[in-house]
Amino acid sequence: MRIVLTGATGYIGSSVLAALVARGHDVIAPVRSAASAATATNAGASAVVGDITDPGWFTPLLHDADAAIHLAASRAGDGAQFDGAVADAVIAAFGGTGKPYIHTGGLWIHGPSDDLTEETPFNPPALVAWREGVESRLEAADLELSIVEPGIVYGHGAGIPASLADAPKDAEGRLTVVGDGRQHWPTVHVDDVADLYALIVERPAPAGRVLALSGQSPTVAEIGEAFADGPVVPEGPDASRTRLGAGYADALMLDQQGS
């Protein structure tokens, strides 16, 4: 298949690219810069430099593809506008064609839950409240749509869990963890997420909404202890909001579990 993959040089996207190339797919990687183009090309993609939020540029690229996977994210904090522009191009190019489109969402849209499923109602924190509007537009369009919601992704020394290692330490040298540390994070390895995207794009029918989870939901304190190889201390909600910004901290402090 000829697959357009946005975000092909990102953390998850680079693993998805590797999985697609290994399966023999022809991957077209729209990227922002010549440096990213070189990275994507070296990984086996056909890279093109351009702006995926420009429908005049992105829509024709999609027209020539058999499928598309959207993993790119805005760097400017304007997710609604960024994903909205991508949605415009996808609907224009793929509407009524039967070509598969895989959109990337996220678990945070569901809010706190001790038993997350694809049917869990939306209750998003402010940081990702915009996602519902974009996804509703896509669901209302005539698309062969799948929406993948990755959990807290880890692996290869990166991802949100790895960022705990950079958190401040207290006077006794103990690592501090965001919030009270008792919140659960539903985790998943980046390579497993990549395999899921590849399997979905090859399906004869869309998958609908799919949670990408490992079935393991450790507490943040447990994750921190694994990194620190010793005890950790809670940073506290207010201190976490001050250090990380209220929106991001509140998302990280969600207590979520799922299998």
Language-model regions: role of each:
Residues R2, S15, A194-G245:
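Mid/C-terminal beta-alpha module of Rossmann-like enzyme folds, strongest
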Residues I3-H25:
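N-terminal Rossmann NAD(P)H-binding glycine-rich loop of SDR-like oxidoreductase domains
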Residues I28, A87-L127:
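Conserved Rossmann-fold NAD(P)-dependent oxidoreductase catalytic core, especially the SDR/UDP-sugar
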Residues W57, L61-I102:
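NAD(P)-cofactor binding segment of oxidoreductase domains
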Residues G77, L107-D114, V153-G157:
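Conserved catalytic-site region of short-chain dehydrogenase/reductase
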Residues E135-G157:
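Conserved beta-loop-beta element that borders a ligand/cofactor-binding pocket
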Residues Y154-A165, I200-V210:
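Glycine/proline-rich active-site loop of Rossmann-fold NAD(P)-dependent oxidoreductases
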Residues D166-V188:
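A conserved pocket-lining segment of Rossmann-fold NAD(P)-dependent short-chain dehydrogenase/reductase
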